[in-house]
Amino acid sequence: MKKIQFLKVGDYMKTITRTKYLDRIIELNGTPDIKIITGIRRSGKSKLMQAYIEYLKSNFENINIIFIDFMDLVYEEIKEYHALHAYVEEHYQEGKTNYLFVDEVQMCPKFELAINSLYSKGKYDIYVTGSNAFLLSADLATLFTGRYIEIHVFPFSFQEYCQYYNDVSDKDKLFDDYAINGGLAGSYAYRTEKDRTNYIKEVYETIVTRDLVQKYALPDTLVLQRLSEFLMDNISNLTSPNKVSQLLTANETPTNHVTVGKYIKYLCNAFVFYDIKRYDIRGKKYLESSEKFYLCDSGIRYAILGSRNMDYGRVYENIVCIELLRRGYDVYVGKLYQKEIDFVAQRGSEKFYIQVSDNISGQETFERECSPLLQIRDAYPKMIIARTKHPKYSYEGIEIHDIADWLLQE
């Protein structure tokens, strides 16, 4: 019988420093804003907050840290906004820099009244995290009357995945694993694919069948579940509520375009999907008709749909889209005459065009991917990101990148 070594609870819960996010919060230290950490459930918001607290303790003296985690029963008695306010005021220390951290803030009903009141006193540096369905980007301006800054946290990037496993010796194998496992790092604690998949499923189902249903008082979850699965299965396809409602109804899930439109908005508000609008490159204008929707993490697609319709070209396109958003780009789908450019990425004055593919070793596929890029007449960079497994090279002014290399670049 094989000998098994049992480890203590927590031995598998390895953590890494998510430098990009930590540096961003450090930049905001002391600014007169409420710092709000958002992101999908289990994306690492609480871990980021804890890392920042450790940074403060290690680098500053004469500080007072007031930390409240509403998941901890210790704070059960202050899950009422008057009590929360009183607790913070009681723990204020005169003559010190007072930091207030509230984790899972949505568990205190009307928390915004307490936070706004504390903010108005001008004596706390305030940081909060909350569930993705209850601390929505769209709601922040309504909830918080003072100035606020949102720090949006994504699941692990491929670079962070490699950092977690402390290995880039075989980046191709690691990338193959990442495309399936995704970036929800809590799943990495499990030894088997089945257990990892179950973890991801539970996170996803909690968002769809509990968080969103509770937030929006939905009568049932069937349409929402089928819609979400449809969007996963149709990544990279142009989509409209009217078209989706017709397809769902034809497949024994009766609904209408109004409901579909609302539910898509809910899924995007909760950061399950990101909507990418179209941009007319020649006319230099944004288009209102049809959009594309990309899933927050490729691991969710595999956990929910399995290998069904496992089109790696679409999976890679999804990974590239989320990476562009993670790097702070505004992302659009490009339209040029009758052709389509997978992504137009813009950040300040920087702009470039991207085509994403799986295998471009065949001449016909290679020419098909190059064709739309070659028709663009401006001087902005153009690139193809594909599974080449070769160093970067150029063709007719187009940079050809291996996807694993490109993901590790920044």
List the model feature ranges, each with a label.
Residues M1-I26, G30:
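N-terminal pre-Walker A segment at the start of P-loop NTPase domains
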Residues I37:
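Hydrophobic anchor at the beta1->P-loop junction of P-loop NTPases
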Residues K45:
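Conserved lysine of the Walker
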Residues L48, Y52:
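Hydrophobic positions on the alpha1 helix immediately C-terminal to the Walker A/P-loop
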Residues I66, E193-K351:
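Accessory nucleic acid-recognition modules appended to NTPase machines
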Residues I66-K96:
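Short glycine-rich substrate-engagement loop in P-loop NTPases that contacts/grips substrate
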Residues K389-E410:
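Domain-level recognition of nuclease-like catalytic cores that cleave nucleotide substrates
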